[in-house]
Amino acid sequence: MAIVFQSHGGAEKERAVPGPSVRAGRPATGDVAVDEEADFGYFVPPLDAPENYLPNTAETLGELDELGEMMIDVVATPTSEDPTEDSTLPPVFTYWGQFLDHELTARTDREGAISSMVNAHPPVASSTVESQFRNARSPRFDLDSVYGGSAVGEGIDADVVKVISGLRHPTLKNKMRVGTAVDPGPLPDNLDEHRDLPRYGQVQSSVREAALRLAQAAMTPEAFQKFSDTLPQRAIIGDNRNDENLVVAQFHLSFLRFHNKAVDYLASHDTGWIADFSSAQALTRLHYQWLIVEGYLKGVCDPVVVDRVVNDRASHFFKFRAEFDARRQNTRLGNALPLEFSTAAYRFGHSMVRAFYDYNKNFGRPGTGILPRATLKLLFEFTGGGGRLDDNKKLPKNWIIDWTRFTGADPHDAADGEPARLARRIDTELAPPLHTLFKEGEDQADQQLKALFKNLARRNLRRGYNLRLPTGQALHKHLNQIGAVQSSPIQDVSALFAAKPDLKNFLAGTASRFHERTPLWFYVLAEAEAAGGNRLGEVGSCLVASTFVGVLLADPDSALSRGFTPDQSPLKMPDNSPIDSIAKWMRFAAVMQ
């Protein structure tokens, strides 16, 4: 059915004007959602001003590598984390942020002619980056990672559409397909076992065959053989990055379940809404988009900054897009996202990742289950590509997440020595597993290259240098000059680290003068650390909130553009209260007790 939103008197709501359409194409190998090519551009207009950038020298690259090595938490041990690194944010924010990143951007970290970690020096010219470095995901919060996107575009044939159709339930056509976890158990709660991602092993043979044809056309024979061998346990979801670790996989599952519960609710309640796919999809998107601002952004960002951006209708974001369009008239695709956001500021979430989690009663407190905690390594292994799913190619029941431990619904500190039910602080220290990433670099014969690919901090710092991002001070100055922030640039970042003399002395002693020309990603983390690490500082908050709010306002059908609030929704909790928190989202979806 067509969803019609009626106003109830008064002036018509201001509607954002949609930008140019992005260019759709065949999905990347192994994904289901169609690719939608769009632009990246600089929020700080590219200038021939050396002081705005890191020095263009090989020595700078070496010092970035040294800085990356210093960003790993040295207090943590193989079995415990430093409790002083705990923030006040529940751990769901880490993986909620990852899900949102996958909604907006794709293929920004691949080695290529435009962006390279290995050959990061010299940096790529700004004009080349803006004309050739492309986003491969629709820059909209439209849940294409859940629903597959719009299957219309060049090269989108019957096989692409057939695989997208596999996302839907095979007989209950208004619902999304979900998977069922299998023994061994026990379940972590008294809910059902239908809490695995859908996998290719459970779909019709015609869907599997279409997926294999698409993969074979795009892969080497060796890669295709591996893809074919592992297809049964591979998740059939729009963006396969949402099955790279178990927490984001279970977060993705909550959307499938929310959609299905919306269908059930509309069928069993006299709301006036038709209980069909379109209604459930529209309501799922609206609730999700409202929570982005009121739940996620106001958790990780300074709420004052978020309100300022919303009230200003993200004017600085739309000015950025207009300036980019003017610079790139002949090469633009439209719907640009800021490079400073996607390759620096939004990577703040890496610092929130824990090495250990109080995951559920089987892998967490009270410690009488299977293991006293879940390691990050295990959370990567119990996925479609992790190699630990059982012979049934499905998630074991004992690995279903207990969301009460991740959403703040059942908090617990770390006084007993086990992991707190909190994310790590947003600061300049990363958990030790991020020094040696589990699934990266294994195909590199050269040990130095393998070490580079596995070290997340070095990767982020090199990528920012290679893409010629402005320094933190340059971005901060620009935001201040245009009235987007009220604070002044941090002239000497090393002064923030009096309690970390080694880091302080390193920054001040670098030939690249990192203390006053600070890599943007590090600057955003340092700014947050100086404020306590429980949320981003003003610069980080401004860039993240401006991008998210701008993306929502650029979509005339988004919750923010329409002025949607959960109390307007026909969907309610059992006590008739609105679904207005991430905990209520999980409970409505029946993935949290």
Regions found by a protein language model. Name each.
Residues 1-241, 246, 264-593:
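Terminal regions of secretory-pathway proteins
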Residues 256-259:
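Juxtadomain coupling helices with adjacent low-complexity linkers
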